[in-house]
Design a protein with these regions (language model features):
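Conserved PLP-enzyme active-site core in the AAT-like
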Residues: 1-149, 154-170
């Protein structure tokens, strides 16, 4: 089958939370667009990438066609995500949403929480990253845990248990 979409995630949990740079994003987008294939970014942790790279989120996604990002993951809003793209794309997405019956009534209060998250919580992600490194540093002191705190640039902490049998540590 022919590829119809290239999807990226920034940051990606399987990559240890290491952010894709603007150059990485552009390289992928250039190849995909050369084949007339659109590029979508799952930006659930896009703002974490932005903070870690000290690069505006808009700069990270300027070469892609569409992006979604979550207002609750990391930013602290109770719910909500945004779908961003060209005016034509957003118009079509709204049409599909209405055809499929998806809607939320009286969502102004929840939308207000999303706006507060965007306006005030992005800067606090640096604290989240610092706390993750602090946790990783503490875990590195625990016998039986293998972890490299320096290899964690964002808020995701990964470690390996050195023991394969829990009886060995009991």
């Amino acid at each position: 089958p022919r590829t119809t979409l290239v999807a990226l995630e920034n940051t990606h949990n399987a990559a240890g939370g290491v952010p894709l740079t603007p150059e990485d994003m552009k390289s992928v987008a250039d190849v995909a667009h050369g084949y007339e294939i659109p590029v979508h970014v799952d930006g659930a942790r896009l703002f974490n990438a932005s903070v870690a790279l000290e690069t505006p989120a808009a700069e990270l996604v300027k070469d892609v066609d569409t992006v979604t990002f979550c207002l609750s993951k990391g930013l602290g809003a109770p719910v909500g995500s945004l779908l961003c793209g060209s005016n034509e794309f957003v118009h079509e997405a709204r049409r599909w949403r209405k055809m499929l019956g998806s809607a939320m009534r009286q969502s102004g209060v929840i939308a207000a929480a999303g706006i507060v998250a965007l306006e005030t919580m992005v800067d606090r992600l640096a604290e989240d990253h610092s706390n993750a490194r602090r946790l990783a540093t503490g875990l590195a002191e625990v016998p039986g845990i293998a972890i490299d705190p320096e290899a964690m640039p964002t808020n995701l902490v990964f470690f390996t248990l050195k023991y394969s049998n829990h009886d060995e540590i009991a």
